[in-house]
Curated annotation (Swiss-Prot):
Coiled-coil ranges (or none): none
Pathway: Quinol/quinone metabolism; 1,4-dihydroxy-2-naphthoate biosynthesis; 1,4-dihydroxy-2-naphthoate from chorismate: step 5/7; Quinol/quinone metabolism; menaquinone biosynthesis
GO MF, one annotated term: ATP binding
Entry's transmembrane regions: none
Biological role: Converts 2-succinylbenzoate (OSB) to 2-succinylbenzoyl-CoA (OSB-CoA).
Top-level taxon of origin: Bacteria
Protein name per Swiss-Prot or TrEMBL: 2-succinylbenzoate--CoA ligase
Catalytic activity of the protein: 2-succinylbenzoate + ATP + CoA = 2-succinylbenzoyl-CoA + AMP + diphosphate
Gene3D superfamilies: 3.30.300.30, N-terminal domain of ligase-like
Species annotation: Haemophilus influenzae (strain ATCC 51907 / DSM 11121 / KW20 / Rd)
InterPro entries xref list: AMP-bd_C_sf, AMP-binding_CS, AMP-dep_synth/lig_dom, ANL_N_sf, MenE
Protein's GO biological process: menaquinone biosynthetic process
This protein's record includes keyword Chloroplast: no
Keywords on record: ATP-binding, Ligase, Menaquinone biosynthesis, Nucleotide-binding
Length: 452
């Protein structure tokens, strides 16, 4: 049996709350499993079987979650697609990955329960396909089985003290590996999963655990400061997606909220390294069951959460090298007992003969109190070949004085050749998911340079 089926028949769990909906309604494990069975019946009526590949397009909703789990229960493969993608790209993805059925949230209305054929649970069968945030062309579809998701979940639950008496907010999209990571931690423990309600931060504070990106953490801190008398259940926050300002995590401690910073990737089913946030730059040590090694400064990974491969031509193509490791293309060093991520090997550029790693510069810039988010990119330069420029989102309107303050701050913190020669407002309209694409930013910068 799959976890939800198991909890539905266990006396200690069957009548316990499993899910809190966007409307604030509660579903027990029995009621949840009934909803999933109704969705299984819907899928079977449409012709979905164990050999099918099914896609869903939509923002997080109860029906999308039921579809995700029902597809797995049927033994089919499920692929989530970002609803912000243009229709043409969605069609191209479905064609390229030979998707048999594509459902939108509006397709999942009026589900009725009928007798369903129950596929025997197979934890090692291909179950999920998750798109990577590919920088060029179509993203790759990473295939995981249920066991890999549960193995990944176990390590995070152990670190963050997550058990059946806790709750986690589904704050990240299900089409992204980070959103799926939340679901599998919930299913690993038999805990509660909460959907955000209209007031995101009010519903967040009803949960014990939550996953956020740093900009959301800053907004949460602002919310707590604006509502000093509010009571809250939140005690643990997993951070990801960008550089994390130390001042921000230290401020959360004043509210009794522990934050955790880490390092993960789609191919490993989410988080691989993590630790309680501190003043050091590293991401901690590998979580339970993960293995790593550094080869010519490149991080290689295997172990708990490792994907089966990439989906191509209705087959699974291996993603590991001959030694069984996935080569991440991330540059890292082991320092003071933990892994420190230097940046992407393919982000590095040369300026006047000097190697420049953009993430190293970003790590310094983000420590300035006025900076929410920053990306450093190479800009063509006749004398040096390329020079660094910074795209910045300040927590105040972008202005000459804000830039000058930042430049003064960097004078004694970065070597001169690493200091950006120009600053531009970060074009936030490019944000389509959890993180902004460097490729899109580079294209935006190139067009800007052409115009000027």
């Amino acid at each position: 049996m799959y976890p939800w089926q198991d909890f539905a028949i266990q006396p200690d769990f069957s009548d316990k709350i499993a899910l809190r909906t966007t409307q604030g309604d509660m579903l027990t494990w029995i009621e949840l499993t009934t909803k999933i069975n109704q969705t299984v019946a819907f899928l079977q009526k449409k012709g979905v079987n164990a050999e099918s590949a099914v896609a869903f397009v939509g923002k997080n909703s109860e029906k999308i979650l039921f579809l995700y789990l029902a597809t797995i229960q049927l033994g089919a493969k499920v692929l989530g697609i970002n609803p912000a993608f243009p229709q043409e790209k969605i069609a191209k993805l479905c064609e390229f990955y030979q998707i048999d059925f594509c459902f939108y949230d509006k397709d999942l209305l009026n589900l009725q329960e009928i007798d369903v054929f129950t596929q025997k649970a197979d934890f090692f069968r291909p179950a999920t396909m998750t798109l990577t945030s590919g920088s060029t062309g179509l993203p790759k579809a990473v295939v995981h089985n249920v066991q890999a998701h549960l193995d990944n979940a176990k390590g995070v639950c152990n670190l963050m003290k997550f058990d059946c008496n806790q709750s986690w907010l589904l704050s990240l999209p299900l089409y992204h590996v980070s959103g799926q990571g939340i679901v599998w931690r919930w299913l690993y423990c038999g805990a509660q999963l909460h959907f955000p309600e209209d007031d995101f931060y009010a519903s967040l504070l009803k949960t014990t655990h939550v996953s956020l990106v740093p900009t959301q953490l800053q907004r949460l801190l602002d919310y707590l400061q604006e509502n000093p008398s509010i009571s809250f259940a939140t005690r643990h926050i997993l951070l990801g997606g960008a550089h994390i300002p130390t001042e921000l995590t230290q401020n959360m401690l004043k509210y009794g909220i522990e934050t955790y910073s880490g390092y993960g990737m789609t191919e490993m089913a989410s988080t691989v390294f993590a630790k309680k946030s501190d003043r050091k730059q590293g991401v901690g040590q590998p979580l339970l069951g993960r293995e790593y090694c550094l080869v010519n400064d490149e991080i290689w990974l295997k172990g708990a959460g490792l994907a089966m491969g990439y989906w191509k031509d209705r087959q699974i193509v291996p993603l590991t090298n001959n030694q069984g490791w996935i080569q991440t293309k991330d540059k890292g060093i082991w320092q003071e007992g933990e892994l420190v991520i230097i940046g992407r090997l393919d982000n590095m550029f040369i300026s006047g003969g000097e190697n420049i790693q953009p993430e190293e510069i970003e790590q310094v810039i983000i420590q300035h109190s006025s900076v929410n988010q920053v990306f450093v990119l190479p800009q063509k330069n006749k004398e040096f070949g390329q020079r660094p420029v910074a795209l910045v989102d300040f927590n105040e309107p972008f202005s000459k004085s804000a830039v000058e303050n930042l430049m003064f701050f960097l004078q004694d913190k970065l070597a001169r050749f690493k200091q950006p020669i120009a600053y531009y407002p970060l074009p936030l309209m490019l944000e389509k998911g959890i993180k902004i694409s460097r490729k899109q930013l580079a294209d935006w910068l190139a067009k800007r340079d052409e115009i000027n």
